[in-house]
A protein has these predicted regions:
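Interfacial segments of alpha-helical transmembrane regions
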Residues: 15, 73-83
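C-terminal TM-helix exit segments that contain a strictly Trp-centered aromatic cap at the helix terminus
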Residues: 87-95
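Conserved small/polar residues in nucleotide/adenosyl-binding loops
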Residues: 139-143
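A structural feature that tracks compact, well-ordered secondary-structure segments
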Residues: 20-24, 28-36
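Functional transmembrane or membrane-interface alpha-helices that line membrane-embedded catalytic
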Residues: 4, 34-77, 95-135
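Short, strongly hydrophobic alpha-helical membrane anchors
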Residues: 1-8
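Alpha-helical transmembrane segments of multi-pass membrane proteins
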Residues: 20-24, 56, 60, 81-88
Length: 143
């Protein structure tokens, strides 16, 4: 992504929507396994959780910006871990102030920050972001 062309913007928009839907599917599936019934995990009308789409777009852009530097799996994991943590905290804070409600609360889990982010999810986001970026890179190299 040397320059921000229409093709790059379309790619990022596609990533946003695909991963918003996949994130919603994952959350609904996890809650179905936990409670044995359907629970809509989105706060919007429709099957998507925009925080997942925003996260993957953020990771993709940051890895692209830093690609001129030494790029590694560790760098991608760090960007995913830290970036998703900042994004999740900011979104949680905004939603609480704007709508006077909390969409998630990790306060009962160890190693959380104000109940907004939790180390366990950050590790999963780091791994997930790394897997997605590596898969996308591998796919682009083969194309």
């Amino acid at each position: 992504m040397d320059n921000l062309s229409l093709q790059h913007i379309c790619y990022l928009v596609l990533l946003f929507f695909v991963f918003s839907v996949l994130g919603w599917c994952m959350e609904v599936l996890l809650k179905y396994i936990q409670y044995h019934r359907f629970i809509n995990r989105g706060f919007l009308i429709g099957p998507y959780c925009p925080i997942y789409g925003s996260g993957i777009v953020f990771i993709t852009v940051m890895v692209s910006i830093l690609s001129g530097m030494e790029s590694s799996v560790g760098t991608t994991f760090s960007i995913s871990f830290i970036g998703c943590g900042i994004l999740e905290y900011a979104v949680s804070y905004y939603l609480e102030k704007r709508f006077h409600a909390r969409w998630w609360d990790y306060s009962t889990k160890p190693m959380n920050l104000h109940g907004r982010i939790w180390i366990g999810n950050l590790i999963l986001f780091g791994i997930g972001g790394t897997l997605v970026i590596e898969a996308v890179s591998y796919t682009h190299l083969r194309a």
